[in-house]
């Protein structure tokens, strides 16, 4: 009987961590993210387990264990972050996992009220701030901001390396940041399409005119296409 009484606080802490982690994960699951209900519940529960085990073996070390948990979650969060061209996806999901670990730490320490308050705030951040971010994205772009552009040029495949180097020199001259450079076979046989991913000032007209006018002087280039990256 005494052993059961001793186990009750341990189980209560783990259940609280699992439930609050699942609550955070439910929102991620609803939005069809990679790390959903189960992942967040397990992260919170695991963090609570580490805290509880450290308190059992060395009651003075939960702070040190909490710091180790933060480092460990970094590896897990990196697994949900993906780069697609110039776009990075999964940052919010990784941050949510990090927060779930924090909830688990609070539950492991028995700070249930703090854990519940933090869970509510995390959910508000993921739900309410999402709407705010979408509204901000719909506002006119600041002239002082940056935009992403896609520049595509088509050339004969034998001239690809020369055109690539020439393109790099022009981009450097235009003082615009090159984020990526690659090539794929063009629709016309024997030709290559070189794709440059650029980041520059939102007022891009002068930069675009400079790049296109310089490219137009190269006889090896048969087609040019400039567009704003809408992703």
UniProtKB/Swiss-Prot annotation:
<dbReference type="GO" id="GO:0005886">
    <property type="term" value="C:plasma membrane"/>
</dbReference>
<feature type="transmembrane region" description="Helical">
    <location>
        <begin position="39"/>
        <end position="59"/>
    </location>
</feature>
<comment type="similarity">
    <text>Belongs to the MgtC/SapB family.</text>
</comment>
<keyword id="KW-0472">Membrane</keyword>
<dbReference type="InterPro" id="IPR049177">
    <property type="entry name" value="MgtC_SapB_SrpB_YhiD_N"/>
</dbReference>
<dbReference type="InterPro" id="IPR003416">
    <property type="entry name" value="MgtC/SapB/SrpB/YhiD_fam"/>
</dbReference>
<keyword id="KW-1003">Cell membrane</keyword>
<protein>
    <recommendedName>
        <fullName>Protein MgtC</fullName>
    </recommendedName>
</protein>
<keyword id="KW-0997">Cell inner membrane</keyword>
<keyword id="KW-1133">Transmembrane helix</keyword>
<feature type="transmembrane region" description="Helical">
    <location>
        <begin position="62"/>
        <end position="82"/>
    </location>
</feature>
<dbReference type="Pfam" id="PF02308">
    <property type="entry name" value="MgtC"/>
</dbReference>
<feature type="transmembrane region" description="Helical">
    <location>
        <begin position="5"/>
        <end position="25"/>
    </location>
</feature>
<comment type="function">
    <text>Virulence factor required for growth in low Mg(2+) medium and for intramacrophage survival. May be involved in regulating membrane potential by activating Na(+)/K(+)-ATPase.</text>
</comment>
<keyword id="KW-0843">Virulence</keyword>
<keyword id="KW-0812">Transmembrane</keyword>
<dbReference type="Pfam" id="PF21770">
    <property type="entry name" value="MgtC_SapB_C"/>
</dbReference>
<feature type="transmembrane region" description="Helical">
    <location>
        <begin position="103"/>
        <end position="123"/>
    </location>
</feature>
<dbReference type="InterPro" id="IPR048640">
    <property type="entry name" value="MgtC-like_C"/>
</dbReference>
